[in-house]
Amino acid sequence: MSAVGNILSMIKSLSAAEKRELKMMLLENASATMSDMESFMTDERFAGGMVCPHCGCLHVVRNGHQESNGKQRYLCRDCGKSFDITSNSIVSGTHKGLDVWERYIACMMQGLSLRKTAEICEIHRNTAFNWRHKILDALQDIEDNVVLNGIVEADETFFAISYKGNHSNGGSFTMPRKPHKRGKEIHTRGLSKEQVCVACAVNRSGKSIGKVSNLGRISTKNVDGVLGDRIDENSTLVTDEMNAYVKFALNRGINLVQVKGGKSKKGIYNVQRVNSYHSSLSKFMRGFNGVATKYLNGYLAWHNFMKYSKHTDAERKQLLLRRVLTLPKKVVCKEISNRDALAFAV
């Protein structure tokens, strides 16, 4: 047996506590050097040559090094702006080496708490929070390009509206209702405006869409706002008997099959996959002890990436590194906490 085989056999004999301890030790020692990550970022972001991240032009020259950290800087001869390899990305202006970001992503992949992640990455808890939402914002941009084809099942699920995190916004936030007592459930009957509707769709190859659509009962306009242009016109849409989908499918020219309430299927069609998606999403969200509604879309994208993408954990980590860190998107920390309490049209 190889050395790796011997190690794997030994790991199987460890207790649950010992396995957790080993995982923490590996995470703390698995990060690449800063120079390795800078080379990685340069290769991934500028594989075809140096391009200005501000205007996209190719007329770029070297422009010395940054005094604080020694990073190579560049100057665009067209727009006159200077930049480094991280400019106009989510890691821009974070004042941490890219090796710390790799360690952070490893913690995120393991589902570690912000407190534990901050400890391992040697950053403040507030920084860990902001980094999470920078990554989730970039992940949303990627997930928004997912288009479903084949047999697509669609249905809604609901979360209680949460104004968590809005009360400290410099007095600019006013609660639109009386606060609920801790641990008390919402007592409004039916699908009230206290319920956040999440429109969901899953196809049989495992691709998924999940996004906040509205408050209360979903309408055709709400369905189109989430699923419009994201379901191939040659697909078959399978739903329950909700009327909102009838007009949506008609307007989009999509074949619609509706399964009657109380029935598990209609021929080869059913809504079992989207129901399973709801269960998976509910379990995933419980791990965060309440998510503010203004951040909900980010967690939906995270769930889809982790649970409904056919990749190994190692492949997911590489995808996050290659696509999320290099995505041309800048997120300012102050903007994260100051987002609207309801990040969608009510």
Name the predicted role of every residue range.
Residues 1-346:
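Residue-level recognition of single "structural anchor" positions
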